[in-house]
Amino acid sequence: MDGSQLGVSRRDFLRAAGVAGALGVSGSLLGARAALGHGGEDHGADHKAGHGAADSGGMAAHGGNGTVGDVDLSRFDPSKFLREFYWGEERTEGGRTVREYELSAEAVEVEVAPGVMYPAWAYNGQVPGPTLRAREGDLLRVVFRNRDAHPHTIHFHGFHPAGMDGVFELVAPGQEFVYEFDAEPFGCHLYHCHVMPLKKHIEKGLYGAFVIDPREGREEADELVMVMNGFDTNFDGANEVYAVNTVAFHHQRHPVELKLGELVRIYVVNVLEFDFVNSFHTHANFFDYYPTGTRLEPSEFTDTKMFAQGERGIMEFSYDFPGLFMFHAHVSEFAELGWMGLFDVKE
């Protein structure tokens, strides 16, 4: 039984689940909330006691918010995904670089919190799909195979011919399509399915980041990819779980390791459905922000950035002090439901 059948709003669900969790109640309606380890609404005392007392896993750092247990990281590991880039198979044709990628759409179960499985549609069996990467001016060839029971496509943000737009050329189950276009403009982009109902095809997981480097390159940095997403686990048209790279609170349990003083570059993409905006906030630090990454000079120096759906950009910063530093959505509900993590800065 889902929340819509019970006539329960998302916020009613959130309020009730804390009480039910304390009483040991389980079930599909309460499973996501219970896995996220929430208790009652008043976390004030825990919050004050928790700060400055983070353990190595970061779980004591914020009043007990976090998951109970861990997901099966052999299925999908957000920590590995952070620094994985799919450059494709590179060859030279007619004096220019050609990159060929292979993507497939298929139905998979994704673990978004410990024991909470979500029936997803995914590119190459993972949510988000692989982070595609190329250099400005490369010729890209993407072989797409549909291994699902529904028609799907790939729509790439960027420049390409009309026939490569992934809107009208539906790929039927068991069929394939080859997208071919030049890698431009440089920047931080995304790709996603564009079959109607569009909301369903995106929120079920058919999306990924798409990075094009400028011809002259960028300054060397520790590069990360963070795709901000959410999951409607009871199918009521509202998210119960929020995350960076799919798994709630993953980077609170497994902090992102950074080196003191080293330049960090994060490619941030927002694909959140059902909510108008998302956000990214860094504690004890500011970052240079490059909207869509299509300019080589930052537009602002800030510690909080708002993102509409499909909006993306590049954040650059370094830390002057070692230790654990929080980052999270500055929409409090999102942070409490999984979109929260830690940077572990080491000398």
Question: Where are the language model's segments positioned?
Answer:
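Surface-exposed beta-loop interaction hotspot
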Residues: R218, L224-T233
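Extracellular/periplasmic metallocenter environments
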Residues: R141-V143, R147-A221, T302-E347
